[in-house]
Regions:
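Short hydrophobic beta-strand element within catalytic cores of glycosyltransferases
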Residues: 303-306, 316
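Active-site donor-binding acidic/aromatic loop of nucleotide-activated sugar
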Residues: 240-245, 258-267, 273, 323-324
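Conserved acidic donor-binding segment of nucleotide-sugar-dependent glycosyltransferases
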Residues: 317-319, 323-330, 339-345
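Acidic donor-binding loop of glycosyltransferase active sites
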Residues: 91, 260, 275-289, 302-303
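Acidic anion/phosphate-binding donor-loop and adjacent secondary structure
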Residues: 128, 156-160, 166-167, 174-193, ...
Length: 390
């Protein structure tokens, strides 16, 4: 099966890392088209996955108005025509983001190729403007053969926004457990590299630096924890959120935490860094569609605390495979960090259970098989659920 993958971003976020894992299986019979250049192209090339950058970024943000969307049509139409021409060489179009859905839906009409939409977002007011919610739902309902949701939370939000339930199927992100378990051997070298003492309890936060990711909550929580508890913030600002980084650094300075908080920026050795931590925290203030870092931490054998909202609640069983904390509450977060700090044996045992759970439930091989079956059905029945709409 030949697949044309579409993604709007040149920067590797969660949706892009998921696409990387999927495309790797089809690398000898696929093409990944990006709407902007960046590190994601380099990452695809490093994995021998064919990639082509088609255009500069479309000028539509998650909260943009319909007028701004219309103004971008000068870019949209040429891009759609390029994709339509390319897609005639492939069996199906696989749109991995919302802007890719817009382009892919129009291109699929011209090329008569079935469209698959991989939904990595929660279509809610916290994440999208009402206009963009309507655009996504309308295009998916009308043109997609199937909507692959990355969690039950994403699927439920799609249906609540008007999406057809019969179109959607939930397929979680897949992971290669061996890649993360190998990182455990790097725990001591990494801790030595950063000068962590044996007594230091290191809390890791892994995501792009953005207000809704909640790094400021972890920084505030540290003020309620023992002085031997420190934090590393791994990730960089994307999408024009550099001001938030300065706010975080000022917060650290104002709270006299300069010696307890390290900003590491973007790192490619995330698994090694996770394995070096005593705890990984996920602090998103809005519901997370999935939460890859949660599963990655589990696979590394590192205990994890996650915000109790969205897809994260499907990944963590409180007190069994990790801990859930009320979003936006630094005091509750500090309480759980203290709990893990005071009970190392219990924390390690829970981390072991989580590692087993993640290895069994999110194995990339099994996820690949689920996706392959769905894509085969799309190729054999290209109209999918939409066959009843014609």
């Amino acid at each position: 099966m030949k697949i044309l993958f579409l993604d709007q971003s040149g920067k590797p976020g969660g949706a892009e890392l998921c696409l990387l894992d999927i495309a790797r299986k089809y690398r000898d019979r696929c093409l990944v088209c990006l709407f902007s250049d960046g590190d994601f192209r380099t990452l695809l090339e490093a994995n021998q996955i064919p990639v082509k950058v088609l255009a500069t970024p479309l000028g539509i943000s998650k909260d943009s108005s319909f007028l701004i969307g219309l103004l971008s049509t000068g870019q949209l139409i040429p891009l759609m025509l390029k994709v339509a021409r390319l897609s005639r060489q492939y069996d199906l179009i696989y749109a991995n983001t919302q802007k890719a859905l817009v382009v892919g839906a129009l291109a699929s009409v011209l090329s008569r190729r079935p469209l698959v939409y991989h939904l990595h977002d929660i279509l809610s007011p916290e994440h999208f403007s009402p206009t963009n919610q309507r655009i996504a739902v309308t295009l998916a309902n009308r043109f997609a053969a199937v909507v692959i949701a990355n969690s039950q939370a994403s699927q439920s939000a799609f249906i609540a926004a008007g999406g057809q339930a019969k179109l959607s199927q939930v397929v979680y992100n897949g992971f290669n457990p061996s890649l993360y378990q190998a990182a455990m051997s790097q725990r001591q070298p990494i801790r030595q590299e950063f000068g962590f003492t044996p007594q230091e309890f290191v809390v890791g936060h892994f995501s792009r630096l953005a207000p809704w990711k909640g790094q400021h909550l972890l920084i505030e929580a540290l003020t309620h924890c023992p002085r031997s508890v420190s934090a590393i913030l791994v990730g960089a600002a994307l999408f024009g959120e550099e001001d938030y980084v300065q706010q975080l650094k000022q917060q650290v300075k104002d709270l006299n935490l300069e010696h307890r908080v390290r900003f590491l920026g973007f790192r490619s050795d995330v698994a090694d860094l996770m394995a070096a931590c005593d705890l990984v925290v996920h602090t998103s203030t809005a519901p997370e569609p999935f939460g890859r870092v949660i599963i990655e931490a589990m696979l590394c054998g590192t205990p994890v605390v996650a915000a109790a909202a969205g897809g994260a609640m499907e990944l963590v069983e409180h007190g069994v495979t990790g801990w859930l904390v009320k979003p936006g509450d630094p005091l509750k977060l500090a309480t759980i960090i203290q709990h893990c700090y005071d009970r190392p044996n219990l924390t390690i045992e829970i981390a072991k259970q989580a590692q087993i759970h993640a290895s069994q439930s999110f194995d990339l091989g099994e996820i690949d098989r689920q996706l392959a079956q769905i894509l085969l059905q799309v190729r054999e029945h290209p109209n999918g659920a939409n066959s009843t709409n014609d």
